């Protein structure tokens, strides 16, 4: 099941799930032979519709970079999705739970670019030169797939299970920090629920960023100055069960908060 009508139908199912707040069965059940190319085609349909409706892409997220998260979801490789301006919230700004379906939070290191990344193969030096600063971030992930019963095909099609994100307010130059050594804690109202470090993100968040930069060049849509790159989770995701504040602290980058309201 890989013709244009089938792809459009699966994309429409995801849009309807988001609009209604009702999850759907895994897309892989509809398309058992679906591969990454097909999944990204589904993602692109919905992202293009958002842009047609006036939404603005402000960067990319990398998913499935932490072995802990890969283990949770039964996958073994990264993926990526688009970040839109409408997904961005300020540090501690209230996020209505009603706009989400089955949200989870994860702590990440975000990069904000000041130069385009257009090389065929990017080095750490390329990334350091092109990055204005790094900052602590919380990504709110969500799935339109029932009970988070996802595999690689499902999450890629679903814009890498993206929802919202929050950037911290303490920018740090990459040359001033060792990202692999950054310890992370993620707590809800003071109770630590997740721990990790920069090395949990493909060994170094810059490995994830280089993977994304290379991939986007191959696709003809390179990362540009001003883009935000969420490099991936530093530890296990935490399910958001009710209203409250989740605070991530990353050594050297400070803290950032995601606050959920009923």
From Swiss-Prot:
Required co-factors: a divalent metal cation
One annotated GO biological process: 3-phenylpropionate catabolic process
GO cellular component term, pick one: cytoplasm
Listed EC numbers: 4.2.1.80
Molecular function as annotated in GO: 2-oxopent-4-enoate hydratase activity; manganese ion binding
Pathway linked to the protein: Aromatic compound metabolism; 3-phenylpropanoate degradation
Catalyses which reaction(s): (S)-4-hydroxy-2-oxopentanoate = (2Z)-2-hydroxypenta-2,4-dienoate + H2O
InterPro entries reported in the protein's UniProt record: Fumarylacetoacetase-like_C, Fumarylacetoacetase_C_sf, Hydratase-Decarb/MhpD_sf, Keto_pentenoate-hydratase
Recorded superkingdom: Bacteria
HAMAP family: MhpD (MF_01655)
Protein family: Belongs to the hydratase/decarboxylase family. MhpD subfamily.
Function: Catalyzes the conversion of 2-hydroxypentadienoic acid (enolic form of 2-oxopent-4-enoate) to 4-hydroxy-2-ketopentanoic acid.
UniProt-recorded name of the protein: 2-keto-4-pentenoate hydratase
Gene (UniProt): mhpD
């Amino acid at each position: 099941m890989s013709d244009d009508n089938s792809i459009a139908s699966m994309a429409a199912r995801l849009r309807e799930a988001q609009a209604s707040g009702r999850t759907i069965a895994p897309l892989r059940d509809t398309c058992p032979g679906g591969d990454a190319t097909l999944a990204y085609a589904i993602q692109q349909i919905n992202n293009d519709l958002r842009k047609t409706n006036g939404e603005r892409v402000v960067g990319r997220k990398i998913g499935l970079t932490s072995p802990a998260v890969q283990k949770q979801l039964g996958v073994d490789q990264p993926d990526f999705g688009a970040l839109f301006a409408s997904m961005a919230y300020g540090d501690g700004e209230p996020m209505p739970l009603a706009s989400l379906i089955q949200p989870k939070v994860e702590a990440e290191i975000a990069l904000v670019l000041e130069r385009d990344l257009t090389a065929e193969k990017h080095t750490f030096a390329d990334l350091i030169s092109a990055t204005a600063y790094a900052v602590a971030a919380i990504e709110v992930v969500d799935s339109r797939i029932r009970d988070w019963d996802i595999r690689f095909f499902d999450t890629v099609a679903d814009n890498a299970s993206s929802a919202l994100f929050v950037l911290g307010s303490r920018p740090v130059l990459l040359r001033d920090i060792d990202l692999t050594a950054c310890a992370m804690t993620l707590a809800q109202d003071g109770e630590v629920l997740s721990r990790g470090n920069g090395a949990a993100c493909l060994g170094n968040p810059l490995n994830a960023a280089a993977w994304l930069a290379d991939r986007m060049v191959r696709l003809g849509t390179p990362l540009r100055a001003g883009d935000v790159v969420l490099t991936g989770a530093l530890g296990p995701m935490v399910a958001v069960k009710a209203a409250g504040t989740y605070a991530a602290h990353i050594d050297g980058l400070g803290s950032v908060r995601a606050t959920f309201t009923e």
